[in-house]
Curated annotation (Swiss-Prot):
Residues covered by region (Disordered): 210-283, 331-587, 649-697, 758-850, 859-878, 886-925, 952-1068, 1120-1260, 1294-1347, 1376-1573, 1668-1840
Residues modified as Phosphoserine: S332, S340, S651, S865, S1077, S1135, S1308, S1381, S1382, S1387, S1568, S1925
Keyword Nucleus: yes
Compartments (UniProt record): Nucleus; Postsynaptic density; Synapse, Synaptosome
Membrane spanning stretches: none
Stretches with biased composition (Basic residues): 1199-1208
UniProt protein name: Proline-rich protein 12
Composition bias type Polar residues, residue spans: 493-504, 523-537, 1239-1257
Record's disease association: Neuroocular syndrome 1: An autosomal dominant form of neuroocular syndrome, a group of disorders characterized by developmental delay, impaired intellectual development and ocular anomalies as primary findings. Variable eye abnormalities include anophthalmia, microphthalmia, and coloboma. Other common features include congenital heart and kidney defects, hypotonia, failure to thrive, and microcephaly.
Modification sites for Phosphothreonine: T738, T1304, T1561, T1705
Keyword Nucleus tagged: yes
One cellular-component annotation, GO: postsynaptic density
The species this protein was found in: Homo sapiens
């Protein structure tokens, strides 16, 4: 092994192969996956051999980072230690930046990561692992995470390798071949031998499990045997385990976790294997993971999917990010839990984690169900995190009862873990096992790292491990009992695990229960970092980060992920921390890794620092915290050193934010203390002590720290939440075992929660500078006293953090809030119930914190308890709920289950429930976190993978578990389903799935378990299980009964809660829902029944989602998931939110949906609604949930009801108000959503009285106020056209906008009013989705709106949702736009058009079963159906229900009847209103980031979402609202387009409002913006029937149908891909005949060539017809443009029409014609009304524009317009539109729709051309130019120049010159190859210059000599004769400079005679200089390009040519400068040629 180790190969392969692969592979994550997989298999073997062996430990981390770096930078591997951080950071940044492209990109990234990771760490298991990792990356979303995971894993692996050197060896070969078998066996073998007695079996198991996990992951089956071999138990479990493992494998972490040591490595391998498994794991997946994994697999790369899925799962469950590990966790529930059984199997001892976990608290249960939870949680987690996880899970599982410890098992600590049993036990054992067991440490390389590090410290731990082991054994002996006693034992265990955790051990040894948890905590922090990383990745990472981060952390890596997850899982954290913390080495490593994963760095760093430091700190610190200040310190030192060492290089990068955190390793450590133990809390000692005392706190701290660490608080939070959940679970489990344990756990959580909150807060702070400050606070918080303090301080930070976390990007706030809430809540809950002593303090702090947190979030705390509840309700609703979406229900569910009811019902249930309350709350809280995590990638993948896995898992292994769990579940079903107790677990389980979900399904499941603490609750988990909380489920299966009692109390709530959990699943649950969920649903159904209404709403939401989702989602599943994921991910910033949202929506709906999924769906307000609208609504809920995190839960519940666009939003707003702080977070969305949701929910009484009433009141009040406001404003709005528009709105179209306006009152007062009405109606009628409009919004729009909102918000609101939302939105936009038509007549015409559009959209949607189409279809058709259904049923209810809405609705119906004919229109029109919500969503995201104020900033985010409209909307939402509303829909897509793009991670590409199809877009002659060169010669076509789908897909970012290049009589197929988030098409070798009537079946499409790589052409579809035809189109465009201009914002609407451009085209043309024909008239007309009702006119205009421009690059325009509009609108919300319109009018003349063009080119220069840009200025005008052309088409080159086409051409020209500067032969080569990319632009520009030169020449009389001189010399000196001199009127021209070759621009070698002087007339001198400048312009520009390249090359080391060119081209200011000088030159030439 060592020998392998040495092989730097790992580094190389890692770095090189994988690392760089990412870049290259990024494009094809799949490729990477496959490639990686294939290549890695062999390569990896080698790599693996070395890599793993590689001193990953110290290096691994780095390596990982390096891997990451590698990802980023092939050289990364060389980056090794220093690189890691950077690389990670790079990775993260890359991931984030590429978030959109996540799929491949992320994949590849991850892949890179992963590969390296595996290569690195898992080399041994590498192949599989790597593959898995790779595969993981495969899962688009996951990739990042996966990569991270893998990436991180290496660290753990690295460590692991040590321990597993032999193993590695074994693994190496065997691994390679069997990948899993060997891995497993070898793992087992190695481990076993390594492990020694207790450990052996455990280890063996663990190893086995790990290996098995891995194996299963890798081999699944093969592994299974090995796995089984380990323990007899395993066999059955193997299935599970495999599943688990698969999950794990997928999770890799699971495996890794499971085998933290070797396995960990392997685990990573596992994780890695996961991916490969997909290849090969697929079968395995089939086996176990298959369900889960397969879904993952389902993701693009099946292999990745597993990991992904796992991670997803994890993420979901384990905070997605932890994903890998967490995935395990999450998976655990799924497979882990299921695996739980697997774990359980392991529990039996197999997966030590499971075993341990099972053994731990639930040795039996775990095995049975507790194990499931622990095992499942632990098991699963274990699987995923087997070691770490388990460990963590131990922490988690430990919490789970050590079941979690399966992770420990990973280290064999399982037994220990088991032994530890307690979380601590699990932990300890996990850790110990991992650490100790690994000798475990040694063994648990992953752990080892940590272990090693810790071991380092102790190995002590290593030894400690043994000791731990012994301890563990003790525990082992009494794992179950330890569970009770485990806390302390856990601590001891912790100790044990600590070894893993080392610190844990140290501390654990301390035996402080807290320490255990602390360890967890540590793990968590670690996890957090992971998370952080994840978060960094946010979507991918986030998802992954968690898994990843954890991985990273877990990597020290695996552990990190594991523990991160675990930490998330809390115990897992512990376990993981070992990875991370334990890893002193890993910690170091982790740190490194974490740091490495810079994303983690902050968190990681922090975490790491904390993890490393904190780790150390955490582990150490944690442990320290735990109490062994000394050892920890020691460890810290050591670890710190390592970490620092590792981290340092890497950390610093990460450290930036985290650095402080991490960077501080020591300090950070201390600082991290917080993270680490309070670690950074400056007072490491204190924190430590505190930690000790308050390990929970510490834990939380850890968690929080994690969060904090997490920059990506979201993930961190999630993770934290998960961790907490886990911890909770653990606690509960433990608690169950022993209240104390619980307390510990809980306390951990509680304190942790607080801490978490603090940390979260802190976390964000880390992200923000505040973080650091905050950190101390959190620190303090950590400290008991600090608690309150922290809260105080925290609150502010939390928002930050929250935002950070939540939004991760834009949505952090919500996320944070959610997280905070969850954390806090859980803390409180936990604290309250558990906090006996420490807990209580924590609780107070928690409450305080919570309160502060809430407040900070905008949640208003109520009573602490109530507040908690409310918080849960509110916060959760607001922030969390958003997360929870249904989470609210979730919280209730948890609350209900445990505390769910408390949430709604009160805390009693929670309390009654047995600490469940806290748990419940906690769970929910966690859930949000989890959710956050989950949604990211998880959602999609999960949906895809998740479901299958669930089903399979449930069906198969899961089924077993499930059966187990099933009955209990059934029992608990009520509990889970309806019963709160189960609910929480369910939630939890879902949590794992959707970490944010319930308490964290996987991890959370454990958390839930904690909730259930209750193992019973775990059963609830079972409920969750369906979600994929199998682990939890199984885990909980046993406990279901206990939960059942709670269920009753919490039924109402619980349903929601349960629902939430399920919802969680729902995220991806559809399938899960169907499967696992089914039980849940079934069981839950009844309980849910009460809340049925709520659920109906929620359910509807869920159900809808489920139904729609299932069909659409599932149908779209493959694509849609990715899309969704992308969607979720797409909004990286949003991602967190999205994640959260996603989860929540799903959760809410999910649970219900799950339950609802059952037919009971109808249960909720009406199945129909659920079916039709709900589905949409769910989206909205998600949106609401996501966007209105705070409100969401409330919203979620409410939202379902108030899913309507405005309504939900508004409710949210109310909610927001209610959660005032939250509001800021989500303000728009939040508030509206909350308000709406709240109102609606309230109406429905979502399940939280608190929630309801609060929400209701607030919502209602708010809504009413808003309505009033709107109404007041309405008169204005109503003026003239506005009035008609208002009617239109009333009809529903604009309602949402109104609502939105309501949300953002400014948004659209008029709109607001109508929306208000709907809102009101909706509110009352939320279930029905009150007004038809709303309902349709809910349905058509709800989905769309919700989606939009969510998407806009970047909520993951449901990845599924987002997609749906997107589709729906798109559809809606289409429909709405047309229907929106600004005018009544327009309306009518548009109605027709709309119908057409809708039909086309629908057909498109239907056509492409793309998620979009499907969803859209669903929205359109189905939404129509749902909308229809909604409109039908909902409308009916809506009408009645929606008081106002009803009225508006009828109008809508009436007005939209034409559209309505296609019901979709009505719904669609209604959808427009939803768009407003989306808009709010947009704003919301910004709000997430900031409230309305934020909204402007967010607008950017949102703007992207609603490029034109949104952007205006956010700032001028009020004014923009109306506009925004309709546009919003489009905007939403648009926003999604932009937002998604960035955010959209893997599967969804950036949105494009439309596609330039010949005939449809010709009128818009604008140049198509964007990169690439239009080659006139090439003709591309698309099937006519695919056009709508294409447009829809482009708008939603989903996968479009293929396009074809005409090659004479053949058509060459170009298939869609995503690169850098951008949708592009790659040439394939598939051809079709193109002759005869085939030619009639295709329509020409305009594309631009992007590049030719490997002889493959890559093109992108233009949104507008390329510039090649600008003149004519320009003119036409001018006219159209004027409207466009006027309605630049309107661009978004066009987007909508875009989908059905064709149909719309006619209408467009027709309806447009009037406007077009009378643009001025029309324009003016709208302006007048516009003034009164700007929005409307704007919207109208937009619509018109849309119409006019139709598909014109609305997007670009939108963006531009958004930009412009934004400023304009911002300036005057109302005015902008008006001004805009008027402006538009002038613009009209100039025809400059600055917005449009500006988008791409003027992003920076936007200001110029923005609002006033002026025709030329606005030259975004380019298109405008067209307008200008009318003036003088060619007259003003300047103007022409400013066109987008010209800009693109010029950009290409500069790129060519830059390339020439780097390669002198470039131009010649271009000529020789007849390059079509650069030559045409060059020739055009040269021709332009020559043309002007000739014109100038006409004014000159040049002598041949002078002309020759001017031509020869590039410089010209002009000397004016002085006065009095004879030549007074003359000027001397002195040509100078070095002559050059005009063609190649290279200097002439021959000497040229020196130029003489020439005298010319003064008046003519300007002509000479102008002529000279024109002649030499190319050379002069070339020289400037050369200077630029030299500057870049000078500043960076060996950059490749490509990189230099890219950097130059990214220098927008420089490009603008060049372009401006070029424009000026031509303008000058023009002026001179005219006069003279």
């Amino acid at each position: 092994m060592d020998r392998n180790y040495p092989s730097a190969g790992f580094g190389d392969p890692l770095g090189a192969g994988a690392g760089w692969s990412y870049e290259r592979s990024a494009k094809a994550s799949l490729v990477y996956g496959s490639s990686r997989t294939s290549h890695p298999e062999t390569d990896i073997l080698h790599r693996q051999a070395y890599a793993a062996p590689h001193p990953l430990q110290s290096y691994a981390t780095n390596h990982h980072p390096a891997g990451l770096s590698g990802l980023f930078d092939t050289g990364l591997h060389h980056a090794g230690s220093a690189g890691p951080d950077a690389s990670v950071m790079n990775l993260i940044s890359a991931l984030e930046s590429r978030g959109p492209q996540p799929g491949p990109s992320a994949s590849s990234l991850l892949s890179q990561f992963r590969s390296p990771s595996w290569q690195t760490a898992m080399h041994t298991p590498g192949p599989t692992e790597l593959f898995i990792s790779g595969a993981l990356p495969g899962s688009s979303t996951f990739p990042s995470s996966s990569a991270l995971s893998a990436y991180q894993h290496p660290a753990s692996f690295g460590s692991r390798p040590f321990p597993v050197p032999s193993s590695l060896s074994l693994q190496d070969p065997p691994f390679s071949p069997p990948a899993n078998g060997l891995l497993s066996p070898h793992d087992v073998l190695h481990l076993k031998p390594s492990q020694a007695p207790t450990v052996p079996s455990s280890l063996g198991f663990e190893r086995l499990a790990g290996g098995g996990v891995l194996g299963p992951a890798g081999l699944g089956p093969a592994q299974t045997p090995p796995y089984r071999p380990g323990p007899p138990d395993p066999p059955p479990p193997p299935r599970h385990l495999p599943t688990q493992f698969n999950l794990l494998a997928s999770s890799s972490a699971a495996a890794a976790a499971a085998e933290q040591s070797s396995p960990q490595l392997y685990n990573f391998s596992g994780a890695a294997p996961g991916p490969p498994p997909p290849e090969r794991a697929l079968p395995r997946q089939d086996t176990v993971i298959k369900h889960y994994q397969r879904p993952a697999s389902a993701q693009p790369p099946p292999p990745p999917p597993p990991a992904h899925a796992l991670q997803h799962y994890l993420s979901c469950g384990g905070s997605y990010p932890s994903m890998g590990h967490r995935a395990n966790l999450a998976c655990s529930p799924l497979g882990g839990g299921e695996p739980s059984p697997g774990a359980g199997e392991p529990s039996k001892a197999g997966p030590s984690g499971a075993t341990a976990g099972a053994s731990g608290r639930a040795t039996g249960p775990e095995a049975a169900g507790g194990g499931g939870a622990g095992g499942g949680g632990g098991g699963y987690r274990p699987i995923i995190q087997s070691p770490g996880y388990k460990t963590g899970k131990g922490g988690y599982g430990a919490a789970a009862g050590g079941a979690t410890r399966p992770p420990p098992p990973r280290s064999t600590a399982t037994p220990k873990c088991q032994s530890l049993g307690g979380p601590a036990a699990a932990y300890a054992t996990g850790k110990a096992s991992g650490a100790g067991g690994a000798g475990g440490q040694a063994y648990s390389p992953g752990q080892p790292q940590g272990l090693l590090g810790p071991q380092a410290y102790g190995q002590g731990f290593g030894g400690g491990q043994a000791q731990d082991l012994s301890k563990a054994p003790s525990y082992s002996g009494g794992p179950p009992q330890p569970p009770s006693g485990p806390p302390p034992p856990g601590l001891a265990t912790c100790q044990s695990y600590s070894p893993d955790q080392l610190q844990g051990q140290l501390y654990g040894v301390q035996g402080e229960p807290y320490p255990g948890p602390a360890a967890h905590s540590q793990g968590l922090p670690t996890a957090s970092p992971s998370l952080s990383y994840s978060t960094g990745h946010s979507p991918a990472l986030s998802g992954h980060g968690g898994g990843w981060g954890p991985s990273s952390l877990g990597g020290g890596g695996e552990a990190s992920p594991s523990h991160i997850i675990r930490p998330l899982q809390s115990p897992p954290a512990t376990g993981r921390p070992p990875g991370v913390g334990s890893p002193g080495a890993p910690g170091k490593y982790l740190s490194s890794v974490l740091a490495s994963a810079p994303f983690l760095a902050p968190p990681g760093a922090g975490s790491y620092a904390a993890g490393a430091g904190g780790y150390k700190g955490k582990g150490d610190g944690s442990e320290l915290l735990a109490g062994p200040g000394g050892p920890p310190a020691e460890r810290t030192e050591d670890e710190e050193f390592l970490i620092q060492h590792l981290l340092q290089a890497p950390s610093p990068p990460r450290t930036s934010g985290a650095d402080g955190l991490v960077g501080e390793d020591g300090a950070a450590d201390a600082s991290k203390g917080l993270g680490g133990s309070g670690g950074a809390g400056g007072p490491p000692g204190t924190p430590y002590e505190l930690a000790k005392e308050d390990p929970q706190r510490y834990h939380l701290q850890s968690v929080i720290r994690t969060s904090a660490s997490l920059d990506e608080g979201a993930t961190a939070a999630l993770e934290l939440g998960l961790g907490r959940l886990k911890e909770k679970k653990k606690g509960p489990e433990r608690g169950g075992e022993t209240p104390e344990g619980l307390a510990t756990s809980v306390v951990h959580y509680g304190a942790g929660a607080k801490e978490l909150g603090a940390f979260l807060q802190k976390s964000p702070p880390p992200p923000p500078p505040t973080a650091q400050s905050t950190q101390p606070t959190p620190h303090g918080l950590l400290l008991e006293a600090g608690g309150p303090d922290l809260p105080l301080v925290l609150p502010p930070p939390p928002p930050q953090l929250l935002p950070s976390v939540l939004s991760h990007a834009p949505s952090p706030s919500p996320s944070a809030s959610k997280v905070g809430v969850h954390l806090l809540e859980p803390a409180t809950r936990d604290g309250a119930p558990q906090p006996p002593p420490p807990p209580p303090p924590p609780p107070p702090p928690m409450p305080l914190q919570l309160e502060a947190h809430l407040r900070s979030h905008g949640l208003e705390p109520a009573a602490p308890s109530p507040r908690l509840r409310p918080e849960e309700s509110l916060d959760p609703p607001g922030a969390m709920q958003e997360l929870l979406g249904a989470l609210e229900p979730l919280p209730p569910a948890p609350g209900d289950t445990g505390v769910g009811p408390p949430n709604s019902e009160g805390k009693d249930p929670a309390g009654a429930y047995r600490s469940p309350s806290p748990q419940g709350t906690k769970a929910p809280r966690f859930v949000p976190l989890t959710s956050i995590c989950f949604p990211d990638s998880l959602l999609q993948d999960e949906e895809r993978s998740f479901f299958p896995t669930m089903e399979e898992m449930f069906g198969g292994g899961a089924a077993d578990d499930y059966g187990k769990a099933g009955p209990p579940e059934d029992e608990g079903d009520p509990k889970a389903g309806a019963g709160p107790p189960p609910g929480p677990p369910a939630y939890d389980p879902y949590g794992p799935y959707c970490p944010g979900r319930a308490s964290g399904a996987g991890p959370e499941t454990p958390g839930l378990g904690l909730d259930p603490n209750k193992p019973p609750e775990l059963p609830s988990t079972v409920n969750a299980e369906p979600l994929g909380l199998i682990q939890s489920g199984p885990h909980q299966a046993a406990p279901p009964p206990p939960p059942p009692p709670p269920p009753p109390p919490a039924p109402a709530s619980e349903p929601k809660g349960g629902l939430t959990s399920p919802i969680f699943c729902s995220t991806k649950p559809k399938k899960l829902l169907k499967t696992s969920s089914f039980h849940l649903l079934r069981r839950r159904d009844p309980p849910f029944q009460t809340p049925k209404k709520l659920y109906a709403q929620e359910y509807e939401f869920e159900a809808d989602e489920d139904k729609a989702d299932v069909p659409a989602d599932i149908r779209l599943n493959p694509r849609r998931l990715p899309d969704l994921v992308s969607s979720c991910r797409s909004r990286p910033a949003l991602s967190p939110l999205g994640d959260i949202d996603f989860c929540p929506p799903n959760p809410g709906p999910d649970g219900p949906r799950r339950r609802g999924r059952k037919p009971t769906k109808a249960k909720r307000d009406g199945p129909p609604r659920p079916r039709g609208r709900p589905r949409i609504r769910p989206l909205e809920v998600p949106t609401t949930a996501g966007p209105a995190s705070a409100s969401t839960p409330t919203d979620g519940a409410k939202k379902p009801r108030g899913r309507g666009r405005g309504r939900g939003r508004k409710a949210e707003e109310a909610g927001g108000t209610r959660l005032e702080p939250l509001k800021p977070l989500k303000i728009k969305l939040s508030v509206p959503k909350a308000g709406e949701g709240l109102g609606t929910s309230s109406g429905d009484a979502i399940s939280g009285t608190d929630h309801n009433s609060l929400d209701s009141s607030l919502t209602r009040e708010k809504i009413e106020a808003k309505i009033k406001e709107v109404e007041e404003k309405q008169p204005e709005m109503k003026s003239g056209f506005m009035a008609s528009f208002l009617d239109f709105l009333k009809s529903g179209k604009r309602h949402p906008p109104l609502y939105q306006a309501g949300l953002t009152p400014p948004l659209s007062p008029p709109k607001s009013v109508p929306p208000s009405v709907p809102a009101r109606g909706l509110q009352p009628q939320p279930p029905a989705t009150p007004a038809v409009p709303h309902p349709p919004p809910s349905g058509a729009f709800g989905l769309g709106g919700a989606l939009e909102a969510a998407e806009s918000e970047g909520l993951g609101l449901g990845c599924p949702s987002p997609c749906k939302r997107l589709d729906e939105e798109l559809k809606r936009n289409l429909e709405t736009l047309p229907s929106f038509s600004s005018d009544e007549e327009d309306s009518v015409a548009k109605n027709r058009d709309l119908q057409e559009s809708i039909s086309s959209a629908i057909s498109a949607l239907d056509d492409p079963p793309l998620a979009g189409p499907k969803d859209t279809s669903t929205p359109d058709g189905p939404p129509l159906a749902p909308a229809a259904a909604v409109p039908g049923p909902p409308p009916l209810p809506g009408l009645p229900s929606a008081n106002s809405n009803g009225t508006p609705e009828p109008p809508l119906l009436e007005e939209k009847p034409p559209p309505t004919p296609p019901p979709a229109p009505t719904p669609q029109p209604q959808p427009p209103p939803p768009p407003p919500p989306p808009q709010p969503a947009l704003p919301s995201p910004p709000p997430l980031v900031a409230p309305t104020p934020s909204s402007p900033p967010p607008p950017p985010l949102p703007p992207p979402p609603p490029p034109a409209m949104p952007s205006p909307p956010p700032p001028p939402p009020p004014a923009a609202a109306p506009l925004a509303a309709p546009p919003e829909e489009p905007a939403a897509p648009s926003p999604e387009d932009p937002e998604l793009p960035d955010t959209r991670p893997l599967h969804l590409a950036k949105k494009q409002e439309t596609a330039a199809v010949c005939g449809e877009t010709d009128e818009e002659a604008g140049e198509s913006g964007g990169e690439g060169i239009f080659r006139e010669r090439d003709e591309f076509v698309i099937r006519a029937e695919d056009i709508p789908s294409l447009k829809l897909a482009l708008q939603t970012g989903r996968e479009p149908p293929p396009i074809w290049r005409v090659q004479k009589a053949l058509l060459q197929k170009f298939t869609p891909e995503i690169k850098d988030g951008q949708r592009q098409f790659c040439a394939t070798s598939n051809y079709l005949g193109y002759f005869g009537d085939a030619k009639n079946r295709y329509q020409r499409l305009y594309v631009k060539f992007l590049e030719n790589v490997n002889k493959k052409d890559y093109v992108r579809v233009c949104a507008r017809k390329p510039w090649h035809r600008p003149p004519v189109p320009v003119r036409r465009s001018g006219q159209a443009k004027n409207p466009v201009s006027a309605g630049g914002s309107s661009a978004p609407p066009p987007k909508a029409p875009a989908p059905p451009p064709k149909p719309e085209t006619p209408e467009k043309t027709t309806s447009e014609k009037p406007p077009e024909q009378t643009p001025e008239t029309a324009m003016p007309e709208p302006p007048a009304p516009e003034k009164p009702s700007l929005l409307r006119p704007v919207e109208k205009e937009k619509e018109k524009e849309k119409v006019t421009r139709g598909e014109r690059p609305l997007r670009g325009e939108r963006a531009t317009s958004g930009r412009q509009t934004r400023p304009e609108r911002s300036l005057a919300t109302g005015q902008p539109a008006t001004s805009r319109l008027p402006k538009a009018r002038p613009t009209k003349v100039k025809a400059e729709p600055p917005p449009k063009k500006r988008k791409k080119w003027l992003k920076e220069a936007g200001g110029n051309a923005t609002a006033g840009g002026g025709p030329p200025g606005s030259s975004s005008d380019s298109e405008s130019s067209p307008g200008a052309p009318s003036e003088d088409e060619r007259a003003v080159p300047g103007r022409l120049l400013k066109t987008r086409a010209m800009r693109e051409m010029y950009r290409s020209y500069v790129e060519m010159l830059v390339s020439t500067a780097l390669d002198p032969d470039m131009i010649q080569a271009l000529e020789d190859t007849h390059d079509e990319l650069y030559l045409p632009p060059m020739r055009k520009i040269d021709g332009l210059l020559n043309e002007h030169k000739k014109k100038v020449l006409k004014r000159l009389s040049l002598s041949p000599a002078l002309q020759d001189a001017l031509h020869t010399f590039p410089q010209l000196q002009v000397e004016q004769s002085g006065e009095g001199s004879p030549e007074e009127g003359a000027v001397r021209l002195r040509p100078a400079g070095e002559p050059y070759n005009r063609k190649t621009l290279s200097k002439l070698k021959r000497s040229v005679v020196r130029a003489q002087e020439f005298k010319v007339e003064l008046e003519k001198s300007g002509y000479y200089t102008l002529y000279h400048s024109l002649h030499h312009y190319k050379y002069h520009t070339f020289l400037r390009c050369r200077d630029q390249t030299l500057a870049i090359e000078g500043g960076a080391e060996d950059l490749g040519q490509e990189e230099v060119v890219q950097q130059c081209m990214r220098n927008q200011p420089w490009l603008e400068q060049l372009f401006d000088s070029f424009s000026d030159l031509l303008a000058q030439a023009q002026a001179h040629s005219r006069c003279g």
